[in-house]
């Protein structure tokens, strides 16, 4: 019986530490120089006013499988490079919007930084990402 108590105590400590804010993912920065940060509503406005806007879903395939913004291109940040961007975007002045899971997900931030470094100049960053989109009840697609 003492072993079970030890195990339960150990498990309780692990669960407590896992729930601790010290172990929570940090928020992404508020801004990314060289990009225009947009809300869900602003992204919709840009989509309506810029038909050539390319929306990049920087999330992992397992996240995208749960749903995505209609018309977005699946391009995880880990696969974002000169060749993958060039194959999805007409020119370095074409408007691009990057999104991921939300403010605690750094994937769209990382992908937008890569695009900036490669000379893309018309970048929107949807920092609130999937979390904001779904919390506002906006339409989603699923495969």
Where are these regions (language model features)?
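Active-site neighborhoods of enzymes that stabilize oxyanions during catalysis
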Residues: 138-143
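N-terminal, post-signal-peptide region of Sec/Tat-exported proteins
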Residues: 48-84
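Extracytoplasmic/secreted cell-surface and envelope-processing proteins
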Residues: 64-66, 106-108, 134-135
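Conserved functional loop/turn residues at catalytic and ligand-binding sites
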Residues: 68, 119, 137
């Amino acid at each position: 019986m003492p072993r079970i108590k030890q195990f339960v105590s150990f498990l309780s400590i692990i669960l407590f530490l896992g729930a601790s804010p010290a172990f929570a993912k940090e928020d992404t920065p508020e801004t990314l120089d060289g990009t225009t940060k947009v809300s869900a509503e602003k992204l919709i406005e840009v989509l309506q006013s810029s038909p050539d806007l390319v929306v990049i879903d920087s999330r992992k395939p397992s996240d995208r499988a749960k749903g995505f913004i209609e018309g977005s291109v699946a391009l995880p940040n880990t696969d974002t490079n000169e060749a993958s961007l060039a194959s999805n975007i007409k020119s370095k002045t074409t408007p691009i919007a990057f999104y991921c899971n939300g403010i605690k997900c750094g994937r769209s931030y990382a992908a937008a930084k890569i695009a900036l470094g490669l000379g893309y100049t018309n970048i929107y960053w949807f920092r609130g990402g999937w979390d904001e989109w779904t919390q506002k009840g906006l339409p989603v697609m699923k495969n």
